[in-house]
Amino acid sequence: SSAASDVYKRQQYACLRNLYYKEGYRVEMLSSFEPQFRFFYKWWIQLFAESEGKDNKGVFPVAGEFSEELHSVGQFIQDGSPIMFETFLDVKKQNASLIVEPDEKEDYFDYLDGKDFWEINKAAYHATVAAHSKKLPCLTIEVDELDAYHFGQLFYFFQFACYLSCKIMGVNPFDQPGVEAYKKWMFEALGK
């Protein structure tokens, strides 16, 4: 992708976050069917919560580790309060292959025998986007593949987009008055 296209995507994401916020969506769920994003979610939550959550403003960031949490969280998304929008991370290139091996157990999962987990997760991803987008706004950010280079691009994408989102919202992304308040109370309690 070109540099101009990348800048446009960051700007578009930041603008859409603010548009959804103004429309009353107060929660953003970052979701993926890729287990390698587990610790990335924690970084993303800290980035947006600490940068944007001030002056009684901000979109509350949460993450959905699918398919693990799809049943429980999916129920809320489909039938619960319409408080969130969802951003999916979709990986385009498969890194490894893991085939579901047949076993002797009689269960309802025999139809998956011989299928690759990549194929299963892609089917679940497409079905989830189709279902969730009927209820709430859904965005997709494509990641070419899971390697150091593309993770670096993803980190930069969200850092720049977070800065833009904060500026649009009218908050300073570089201070943390709420964190300083609890640290003051904690230090007093511990005698520092």
Feature-to-residue mapping (PLM):
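Short, small-residue-biased leader/transition segments that mark boundaries at the very start
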Residues: S1-Y8
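A SIS-like phosphosugar-recognition module
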Residues: K9-K192
